C-alpha cells in the first residue's frame, strides 16, 4: 500500500485537488480551517493558474519531452517533433509503474505539480496535502499503481477519489446548491474526453455508477477527419507526417470549444497555416508551412449536422441516456441532472437530457462559471472535509467510552424490564380474580392461588420471553437514538451535512456483525426469563400474603348468611386488587433483587450491550468518513 500523508492539525494548512483529466487538467486549493467550527468556516476554493503566463486555470492534457525539460499544455505544441514528440489524451488505466505509458504519466504529474507550487507561493514542502481524482471502474490494483505513480512524481498524496464523487461533492456544496435535488434523487453527468459517466444519487440509495465510450474526443476526431482532412493537401500531409496528428486534433478540439462557447447563431472561424504547428527546422516546413487548414462554420446547426451525419453522436448519446434510465436506474426518481466536464457545454446536451428524463430545462444544471473546473474544485473541497473529518472521527472514538456507560445502561434496562413484567403480571392477577369471581367453586384462598398459579405458568410459557425481547428492542432503539444525538452534536461542529440521520426503525447496518455481538445475551435472556417466571408466583404471593389473612380469615358462615358466594369472591378479589400499588412495589423490589444477584445475567448483558453499541457507533462512523482511497 502506498504511503499516504496522514493529516496533521499542527502541520497541514492547505488542500490541493488536481484533476488529471484525459483531455484537460485543472487544480484548486482550499485552506484547512482547523480551529473553526463549521459555521465559522469560509471554505474558500481557489482555482490555480496552471498556465501562469496566460493566467489559464485549465490546460490541455498534453506533454512534450524535450532536451532539458518537460513541456505541458499549450507550450507542448511549440515542440511538436522534438525528441519523443507531443502526446495528448495519454491518460489510461495503469498496469505497471515501470510501463512506458505510466512513466509518461508520472512525468506529466511531476510537471503539473511543479506548476501548482510555482503558482501558489504559500505552499511549502510540508504544509499541504494533495488529493487526485481517478475514473470510475478502476480495479483496486490500478488504484494502487496510480497512488504509487503520484508519490513517485513527488506529490504529497492524501488519497484518491472518483471523478464522479468529486463532482457530486461539489454539486452538493453551497457553490452550486444542488443538494436538494440529490436528496430526492439526481444524476451527475460527466462528459469527458474519453468517456461519458453517469452517477445516480439519493439519500436513500447507494450511488449507482455506469460509463459509456462516448467521450467528446469522438467529435474532435470528426472535425479532424471531415473538416480538416477534407482538403487533399492536409490529408496528404497527415499521411506523410503522422506525428502531427495529435497537434491537428488539438486544434480541432480548440475549434470545437470555441464554437460551443458562442451563441448558436454565430459563425466560428478557426483556420490556421500548418506553419503554426511545424517546427522551423523540420523538412516538412518548406513544403507545407503555407498550407492553410480551413476551419469555419456559419452556425452551430452546421457543425451539429456534420457531427450527426458522420458519427451519429447525438443518437448514441440519446440511447445511452435511455439505457441508463431504463436498465441501470429503473423506477428511480430523477429530480435533476448536474453536468460537469468542459464538453457538457455543447448546446444539444441539456435538451436531450431534459427530454429523456422529462425534466424542465432549468433542472439540468451546469456550472456556468466553468464546468472544466468542477472536478478539481470538488476534489479540493472533499479533501478539506476529509482532513477535518479525520479529526472528528478521532474525537468520536474517544467519546465512545462515555457514550456507553455500562452501569447506567444496565440499570435503565432492568428498570424497563421490571416495569413491563410487573404491568403484565398484574394483568394476570387481575384477569384471574375476575374469572374466579364469576366461575369459582368456593371462597377459599387455595382455589384462587391454584388458578393464579396455573395462569402464571401459561404466562411463563407464552409471554415472558416476548416481554424481555420487546423491552430489549425498545431499549436498544431508544439508546441508539440517544447515542446518535450525542454523536451529531460533535459532527455538526466539524462536518455539517454529514450527521447521522434519524430513523424510525433500528438501522443495524451490518446485521450479522451486530447480531453476533448479542449472541452472548441470548442464553442469559433465556435463563432470566425462566428465573423470573419460576419465582414470579412466589414473589407475588409473598407480597399479597400480608393482606390475605385479613381478607380470608372471617368466619365462612357469617358471609354465607349475609351474601352469596360470588358476592363474597368479588369482595375478596376487590380487596386484593385494591392492594395493587403496595403489592407491585414489593414485587418490584423482589424482581430487581433477583436480577441484581444474577451475576451471569449482569455480566453477559453489560458485555453484549457494550459490544453492540460499539459496533453500532463504528458503523455509523463509516457513514461520516469521507470515501478517500
Where are these regions (language model features)?
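Hydrophobic, small-residue-rich alpha-helical packing segments that form membrane-like cores
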Residues: 120, 146-185, 219-220
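Extended, charge-rich low-complexity interaction segments
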Residues: 185-202, 387-421
